[in-house]
């Protein structure tokens, strides 16, 4: 059975992974928000905010879980499986496969991405190596 809501949600996340996510950033106090063309002033300090692409570290801040795929000798982190939604639907971003996988009840949906402009996989790799050291 196909769940259109699940399919749309998975596709939107795959598009975000492929294209990157824009955020408004205050260069004065480092506040980050979703872009709002009607209000570009920082809610914290009032300075003008600029639009930038979210980086991998910012993306992983909202991750619910990260599973790492590593070589048997533990010397190569080959990719990560990142839980980005849980409880209905459950959605994973798999950087090894370039795939977003969603599950909701008995339904499932997948969508692929071929680019990682935010550097999510590199940020996950940095987290893995930091935890191992």
Model-based region annotation:
Residues 41-48, 56-63:
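Short cysteine/histidine-rich metal-coordination sites, predominantly Zn2+-binding motifs
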Residues 13, 17-20:
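Long, charge-rich alpha-helical interaction segments
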Residues 30-35, 46-51:
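Cys/His-rich microdomains that often coordinate metals
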Residues 61-97:
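Amphipathic, interaction-prone secondary-structure segments
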Residues 98-133:
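Polybasic, proline/glycine-rich intrinsically disordered low-complexity segments
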Residues 5-8:
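N-terminal capping/linker segments that flank leucine-rich repeat
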Residues 23, 35-39:
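Processing junctions and N-termini across compartments
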Residues 24-29, 42-45:
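Short cysteine-rich clusters marking metal-coordination/redox-active sites
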């Amino acid at each position: 059975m196909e769940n259109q809501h699940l399919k749309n949600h998975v596709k939107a996340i795959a598009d975000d992974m492929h294209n990157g996510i824009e955020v408004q950033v205050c260069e004065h106090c480092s506040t980050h928000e979703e872009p709002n063309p009607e209000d570009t002033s920082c809610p914290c300090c009032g300075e003008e905010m600029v639009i930038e692409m979210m980086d991998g570290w910012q993306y992983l801040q909202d991750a619910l879980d990260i599973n790492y795929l590593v070589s048997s000798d533990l010397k190569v982190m080959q990719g990560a499986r990142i839980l980005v939604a849980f409880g209905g639907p459950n959605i994973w971003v798999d950087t090894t496969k370039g795939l977003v996988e969603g599950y909701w009840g008995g339904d499932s949906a997948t969508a692929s991405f071929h680019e990682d402009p935010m550097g999510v996989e590199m940020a996950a790799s940095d987290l893995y190596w930091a935890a191992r050291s």
